[in-house]
């Protein structure tokens, strides 16, 4: 196991007292008629309570502090976590089950004339692959999955497929599940196959009676529609139709495994879905209803393995989380009153997308660099003065420990921790890549800091840029690039320069991801940021460019833009015959999904008491009952 081991700061740079020693704290609120009003130090809005506080430090400087809620996860609680699932007996049982499940998968390729026939062999293969992937155990069966999908693809044609290779007619369920699964694995499949399932009026043909089979068919159509490429009109039509159908079905059918599956898929879709969260949900869905697989023995083996794998990884998560919490506490960050303390939440996101135990360096690196990025966000957006920000920006570009000496006391520890973390991650990456990658990281960090500096100047001067100018800078300041670049270099996957350029800046994938996340974040953080005097957002800039528009118009425009960009991102990630394998792009794409998940209903960076807290509990703190 390769941990990113970063020692605490040297005593000359570490600040072990409060980073904010205030003489006067005065709450300030801005009155925004369309968004809410202030009451007793809080800005009341429909979605979030937020205001900022003017704080005068011992140095006499008045600063702004956003009233973010404190850390929810006490270090003593984290250090007290324990689980037995790292013991040898559980590991040995899991290894035995892996062998038995491989036998089950291989048995599907053997026709027995009863359960596996030429009339169902395709859907049987697709179903086992789909279930293995959704249960989060697919890393053990890469060869078996490829063999199954190669077989299915060999019978794929311009009309899709039937349930089996000798089926006379094509089947919507098999075709929808087949298109989704094959496309996710890089096979070239066209969405035109769905045209034949539409009636003359353009609507998809479907029985008026919502049986389990009919509902399952439409559910797979919906899942397939979410990985649409640009220009695929039939996929847009499929998404609209299936969304309406499934919502109506939820109102009619009783609460059961199928209804829970529908509710989950409708809520999280694909871009907000996280592999470990899906596995946790699907373990319950899949294990309670045998309709999901033909053989009960197969169901039992898969479920037992999925539960064991979940809990074994859970034991590793707790050890890594203890490391993260100690790092946060020992480094002095716990004393920073002005910053958002979201290290536990960031680790949770990392461990929900990188569920291979071998990727410890990725999880820890992502956690630390994104936490530090959030601290910088709070310094540049609210706490730092313009003179201090200029000093910090210059220090980052100088990149030397001595550069910390000219910084304000509260900045010294932040700078040194950034310096140590980035350098340590570069050393970790060098072990995997066989070359020094520090220059890549420094270039990304400098671009990140420059974008922050530009936004700070906008805030200070009251300047409101055009929408295009704002987004061009905002897609960098979101921090997707610094949160992605160094962590993926520690995965053990080779990233030669020409491959890295297709994922990192200036690639289209990187550009799209940064733009999507910036715009998605603006929709949920706009009100709170405006209450703190931060006028620049995609919504404000759009309204400036279009004086007759309303906030609702701006949100509608931005949502439509996000949907269009997501389709482009799907293409960049999944396009067949690419020079860059999907496996090389997967974690960069999954990092987008992690950030996107934070903005599902609110600004999850700032407010983590609700959905994100539940995510931590269900995927990191609690194990699955066996």
From Swiss-Prot:
GO molecular function: lyase activity; magnesium ion binding; R-linalool synthase activity; terpene synthase activity
GO cellular component annotations of the record: chloroplast
Cofactor requirement: Mg(2+); Mn(2+)
Top class in the EC scheme: lyase
Assigned keywords, A-Z: Chloroplast, Lyase, Magnesium, Metal-binding, Plastid, Transit peptide
Free-text remark on how the cofactor is bound: Binds 3 Mg(2+) or Mn(2+) ions per subunit.
Induction note: Accumulates in apical leaders upon wounding in both resistant and susceptible to white pine weevil (Pissodes strobi) plants.
Positions that bind Mg(2+) 1: 377, 381
Pathway: Terpene metabolism; oleoresin biosynthesis
Targeting presequence: 1-21
Catalytic activity: (2E)-geranyl diphosphate + H2O = (R)-linalool + diphosphate
GO terms under biological process: diterpenoid biosynthetic process; green leaf volatile biosynthetic process; monoterpenoid biosynthetic process; response to wounding
Cellular location(s): Plastid, Chloroplast
Entries under Pfam families matching the protein: Terpene_synth, Terpene_synth_C
PANTHER family: OS04G0344100 PROTEIN-RELATED
Role of this protein: Terpene synthase (mono-TPS) involved in the biosynthesis of monoterpene natural products included in conifer oleoresin secretions and volatile emissions; these compounds contribute to biotic and abiotic stress defense against herbivores and pathogens. Catalyzes the conversion of (2E)-geranyl diphosphate (GPP) to (R)-linalool.
Protein name listed in UniProt: (R)-linalool synthase 2, chloroplastic
């Amino acid at each position: 196991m390769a941990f990113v081991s970063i020692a605490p700061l040297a005593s000359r740079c570490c600040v072990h007292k409060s980073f904010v020693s205030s003489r006067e704290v005065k709450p300030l609120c801005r009155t925004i008629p369309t968004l809410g009003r202030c009451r007793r130090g809080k800005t009341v809005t429909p979605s979030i309570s937020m205001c900022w506080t003017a704080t005068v430090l011992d140095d006499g400087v008045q600063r702004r502090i956003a009233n973010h809620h404190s850390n929810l996860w006490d270090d003593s609680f984290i250090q007290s976590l324990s689980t037995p699932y790292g013991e040898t007996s559980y590991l040995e049982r899991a290894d035995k089950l892996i062998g038995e499940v491989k036998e089950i998968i291989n048995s599907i390729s053997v026709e027995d004339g009863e359960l596996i026939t030429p009339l169902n062999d395709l859907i049987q293969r697709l179903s086992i692959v789909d279930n293995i992937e959704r249960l989060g155990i697919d890393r053990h069966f890469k060869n078996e999955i490829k063999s199954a999908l190669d077989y299915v693809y060999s019978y794929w044609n311009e009309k899709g497929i039937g349930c089996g290779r000798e089926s006379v007619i094509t089947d919507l369920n098999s075709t929808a599940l087949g298109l989704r699964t094959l496309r996710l694995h890089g096979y070239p499949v066209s969405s035109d196959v769905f045209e034949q399932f539409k009636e003359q009026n353009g609507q998809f043909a479907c029985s008026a009676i919502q049986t389990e089979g009919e509902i399952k068919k439409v559910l797979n159509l919906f899942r397939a529609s979410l990985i649409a490429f640009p220009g695929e009109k039939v996929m847009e039509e499929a998404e609209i139709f299936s969304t309406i159908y499934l919502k109506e079905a939820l109102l009619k059918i009783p609460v059961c495994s199928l209804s829970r599956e529908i509710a989950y898929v409708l809520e999280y879709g694909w871009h907000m879905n996280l592999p470990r969260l899906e596995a946790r949900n699907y373990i319950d869905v899949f294990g309670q209803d045998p309709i999901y697989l033909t053989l009960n023995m197969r169901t039992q083996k898969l479920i037992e393995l999925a539960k064991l794998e979940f809990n074994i990884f859970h034991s590793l998560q707790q050890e890594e989380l203890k490391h993260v919490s100690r790092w946060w506490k020992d480094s002095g960050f716990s004393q920073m009153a002005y910053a958002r303390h979201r290290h536990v939440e960031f680790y949770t996101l990392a461990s929900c997308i990188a569920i291979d135990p071998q990727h410890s360096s990725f999880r820890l690196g992502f956690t630390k660099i994104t936490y530090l990025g959030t601290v910088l966000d709070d310094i540049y957006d609210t706490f730092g003065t313009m003179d201090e920000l200029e000093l910090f920006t210059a220090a980052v570009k100088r990149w030397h420990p001595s550069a910390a000496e000219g910084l304000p006391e509260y900045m010294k520890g932040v700078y040194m921790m950034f310096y140590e973390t980035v350098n340590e991650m570069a050393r970790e990456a060098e072990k995997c890549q066989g070359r020094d990658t520090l220059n890549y990281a420094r270039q990304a960090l400098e671009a990140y800091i420059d974008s922050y500096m530009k936004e700070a100047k906008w805030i200070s001067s009251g300047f409101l840029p055009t929408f295009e100018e704002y987004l061009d800078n905002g897609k960098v300041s979101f921090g997707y690039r610094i949160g992605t670049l160094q962590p993926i270099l520690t995965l053990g996957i080779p990233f030669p320069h020409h491959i890295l350029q297709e994922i990192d800046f200036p690639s289209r994938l990187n550009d799209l991801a940064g733009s999507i996340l910036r715009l998605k974040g603006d929709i949920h953080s706009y009100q709170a940021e405006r209450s703190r005097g931060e006028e620049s957002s995609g919504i404000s800039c759009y309204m400036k460019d279009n004086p007759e528009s309303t906030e609702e118009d701006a949100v509608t425009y931005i949502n439509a833009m996000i949907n269009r960009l997501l389709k482009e991102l799907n293409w960049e990630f999944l396009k067949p015959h690419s020079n860059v394998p999907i496996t090389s792009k997967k974690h960069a794409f999954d990092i987008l999904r992690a950030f996107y998940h934070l903005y599902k209903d609110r600004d999850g960076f700032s407010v983590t008491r609700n959905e994100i807290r539940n995510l931590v509990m269900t995927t990191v703190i609690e194990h699955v009952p066996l």
